Design a protein with these regions (language model features):
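Charged interaction/catalytic cores of defense and host-pathogen modules
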Residues: 1-20
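Short beta-alpha junction loops
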Residues: 108-109, 138-146
């Protein structure tokens, strides 16, 4: 079976630089059995969470790192990327401004956070309405999600099936569902 990419050039996107590589320079096995996705722009993912939900944040980051290995096309950002000496509020604002996918780990602690309510949710909701930013709510624990303005967005999981109420294999299936949704957004846009 001949390599279907043998007569085309491959666009490789690394660190926001586009490099076109003639396919004849790629070993045939380099592209076989791999899905190649052409990305117009690298998507920027902003992750909003309450620090009380850090274990779910960490699990999300692990899943995103695996997804990035397989499809690329995005950069994820959470407050873990803020380093000593940086103006943390400015870093969060910049990341919010740049993001076109927002992942919200919704819990009672998340909804109770004044910082999230006053600094993160307003730009997220504004961009979702005006700029086609995708808002993906991952329901971490039972909360007032259905009474909040976030309930306008279809959540990844059902309010009666939150991550905290699930055994680990079921949690993993919800994270995989979220990864499928992110991949769909990246491939479609």
């Amino acid at each position: 079976v001949e390599n279907p990419l043998s007569s085309v050039d491959v666009l490789v996107i690394e660190d926001d630089k586009n490099v076109v590589i003639p396919s004849m320079q790629l070993p045939k096995n380099e592209t076989e059995n791999k899905k190649i996705i052409m990305h117009k722009d690298k998507k920027k993912i902003f992750i909003s969470y309450a620090h009380a939900d850090e274990k779910f944040h960490n699990r999300l980051m692990t899943h995103l790192s695996v997804l990035k290995k397989y499809i690329g096309g995005f950069e994820e950002w959470s407050d873990k990327k803020i380093h000593a000496g940086q103006h943390w509020k400015e870093e969060i604002k910049k990341a919010l401004d740049d993001a076109n996918i927002e992942i919200l780990l919704v819990s009672t602690d998340f909804l109770a956070s004044d910082f999230i309510e006053n600094n993160e949710l307003p730009p997220i909701l504004r961009k979702a309405e005006a700029e086609n930013t995708k808002v993906l709510c991952l329901l971490v624990e039972p909360s007032f999600f259905l009474k909040s303005e976030l309930s306008a967005f279809q959540a990844v999981n059902k309010p009666e099936e939150t991550l905290a109420e699930m055994e680990k294999p079921a949690q993993e299936r919800v994270f995989l569902k979220l990864m499928d949704e992110i991949q769909r957004i990246i491939e479609v846009e």
